[in-house]
Amino acid sequence: MSLPGLELSQQPIEARRAPPQPTQISLPKGSEWRFEVAFGNTTRVKLLAGTAELFGTELATSQTYTFSGTKAAIYTWHGCTLEVGAGDPVPIGPVGSAPVPPGPGNGGCQVEYIAEETPMAEYANVHFALETMRHDAKAAGRDGPRVLILGPEDAGKTSLAKILTGYATKMGRQPLVVNLDPSEGMLSVPGALTATAFRSMIDVEEGWGSSPMSGPSPIPVKLPLVYFYGLPACLDGDGSYYKAIVSRLALAVTGRMAEDSDAREAGVIIDTPGIIGQGKGASEDVIHHIVTEFSISTILVIGSERLYSTMVKNYDNKPIATSATAAASDERISVVKLTKSGGCVDRDATFMKYVRESQIRSYFFGSPVPSTASSALSLSSTTTGTTMTLSPHTSQVDFNSLSIYSITIATEGEEDEYDPSKFDSFLPGGHEENDHNTSLTGTTSLQPPSGLLPGLRSELPSATTGFPSASTSSTTPFTNLPSPAPMSLANTLLAITNAAPNASLDEVRDASIMGFIYIADVDEKKGQGGKLRLLAPVGGRVPNRAMIWGRKWPGEVVGLIG
């Protein structure tokens, strides 16, 4: 059909909607294909010939991998051929949001190019050095390497942690991986600090992988130990609250290594937030606390000469005084400087907001990105087409039936809510702690569900038994949320701890996390203290446990459910 006066042919609608044909990309040996895919778009990548890997995990030949909201790189040691094509858009944000237009690059990527200068050989040398340390540690009967990765924001710390973990699992190792960065979740939601034993490969499409779910999974699920921090930066409140949770996590990791010979031999890989690599405030004190608590043996510094110089001055060739096996063998700390990859890009606030929302949505609903790995399995009704979906449950509860604690530390731009009169160390003489706890909570007799929420491990120590308290003072920054329910509860998360609803504040802080629930709506005029509409990963009654409000972080997530 011709348009009047222009004599231009108009393409049929079907032709305009047809996606472009896939493109083949040939990578020479020792190079990598770097690509960025926006949230809402998908890019499909298939390895046609040769060998390739994504952050240390090898790609399978003729297997299609689908990526969305990703900034990554596929590296080849010996050369390979990739097929790259655009996939179907996936929904992001509230229902009815406009689809995101595809990018100008191959496969709808926002940016994509081939890079021949990469630090992968350098990273591989680090892996082989760690393997040598593991062999030596096994022969000497001591712990394997405890690796701390430091660097500024967007320097490639998490990518290096994935590479070292992927290479270790490929060698049959079972390293413990610790995430100390609250800005992103590892097998959990943002705001959580986690530790996980990796016994199998890392999921290429999902990053680290997924936590337990009801239903099949193409990649074996991981069992994370989760503690909730609930603040955006580790230096909020001078870092004392953050250090207390780090100590608790270190106790759990040390206990696991003492009981698990495979984990002890493989060692620990620790990813850290970028803010402590920028030399701000109490960052050096936080680094020293991590080094001491985890008995760090190797410090890897990426992308900062200043930080490397400081670490060499403070730690290089210094004895590991806190480790009994290190003291017996005179083991010393090594500080290594690594090259920052040219593929590292800055992630702006908008992108990180999408990352957090995507992790929270995936926790409750599964991944909306189609996966051929999932479709290759005989999946149950929990899958729609080739998309792995989960089925969370909604319920309504009275606000007064829950024991909810709010974090009082002020973040940047907020006024401090800290009130010393709420804590035991400031109570008048003769005032008992049990009386204080009783006055803080008003709970009904609810029974926890028989199933476990994602992130819960039944063998974890309870909040009141097992490990000693990590705190050295009783000034824990929590306050009980009074009735009636504030409207600001809507669209936020609650972290369900393994602490009793009338536990002390230190016990609430030191308790591991059973799982998370989402508050979809608050009706302050109904029920006792208000009515809350909740979204939970499993059905049944809400567990009768103390809960921590994630108002400050990860903050408000609007439109998770209608």
From Swiss-Prot:
GO annotation terms (biological process): mRNA 3'-end processing; tRNA splicing, via endonucleolytic cleavage and ligation
Subcellular location: Nucleus
Keywords on record: ATP-binding, mRNA processing, Nucleotide-binding, Nucleus
Disordered: annotated span: 1-27, 415-483
Pfam families, per the entry: Clp1 (PF06807), CLP1_N (PF16573), CLP1_P (PF16575)
One cellular-component annotation, GO: mRNA cleavage factor complex
Residues reported to bind ATP: E32, K71, D154, A155, G156, K157, T158, S159
Entries under InterPro entries matching the protein: Clp1, Clp1/Grc3, Clp1_C, Clp1_C_sf, Clp1_N, Clp1_N_sf, CLP1_P, P-loop_NTPase
Oligomer and partners: Component of a pre-mRNA cleavage factor complex. Interacts directly with PCF11.
Entry similarity comment: Belongs to the Clp1 family. Clp1 subfamily.
HAMAP family: Clp1 (MF_03035)
Record-given protein name: mRNA cleavage and polyadenylation factor CLP1
Biological source species: Coccidioides immitis (strain RS)
Gene from which the chain derives: CLP1
